[in-house]
């Protein structure tokens, strides 16, 4: 799958890796191939059992898999086979999603729920260190994309996110900041909420309000 040229060519796999590909990535990394891959919050949290009702807000690509697959992705994050967490944020209109399951488009919202979902699945349920999860969602992704972000090092831009890891709140996509509402977490109680966001030192979001 990966030739010797992979050491000189970088490959980034996005939108989540399927479990069957994990051994390939492990072998490639062991050979020194420059390959990186991400996991998504929804593939870490949900399984194909969610599809029983044919709710199109659970339709995505790659599709949801079994509980065994979900656990394999979590362990791949733990051992470094998977390099970072990406939201695969894919908004769609209500009109697009309000179709028969086979005809509705793939994709769900991911930005507003990524943090609480990862805190629940990785930190609370699977005993990841909080600092590790933050690193997977910030610095690791920035490093892969060669972006000067994801760090609080001297001289770095003050791009900050302050959150309360213990705050419980009920998510409703209709009240969210996206123009779309295709989220599988609508109506669910989540734990962990962003309270403030700063971009280059300027506060742009605080206590549920966009300031600029």
Regions found by a protein language model. Give the residues of each.
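Residue-level signal for inorganic ion chemistry
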Residues: 11, 38, 88, 118, ...
């Amino acid at each position: 799958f990966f030739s010797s040229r992979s050491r000189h060519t970088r490959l980034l796999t996005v939108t989540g890796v399927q479990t069957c590909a994990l051994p390939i990535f492990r072998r490639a990394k062991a050979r020194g191939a420059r390959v990186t891959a991400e996991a998504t919050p929804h593939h870490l949290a949900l399984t194909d059992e969610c599809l029983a009702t044919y709710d199109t807000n659970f339709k995505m690509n790659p599709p949801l898999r079994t509980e065994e697959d979900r656990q394999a992705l979590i362990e791949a994050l733990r051992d470094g086979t998977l390099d970072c967490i990406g939201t695969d944020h894919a908004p769609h209109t209500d009109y697009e999603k309000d179709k028969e399951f086979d005809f509705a488009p793939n994709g769900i919202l991911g930005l507003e729920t990524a943090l609480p979902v990862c805190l629940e699945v990785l930190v609370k349920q699977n005993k990841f260190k909080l600092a590790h999860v933050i690193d997977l969602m910030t610095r690791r992704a920035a490093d892969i994309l060669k972006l000067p972000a994801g760090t609080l090092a001297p001289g770095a831009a003050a791009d900050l996110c302050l959150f309360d890891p213990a705050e419980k709140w009920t998510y409703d996509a209709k009240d969210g900041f996206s123009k779309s509402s295709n989220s599988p977490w609508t109506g669910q109680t989540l734990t962990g909420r962003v309270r403030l966001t700063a971009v280059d030192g300027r506060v742009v979001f605080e206590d549920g309000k966009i300031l600029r």
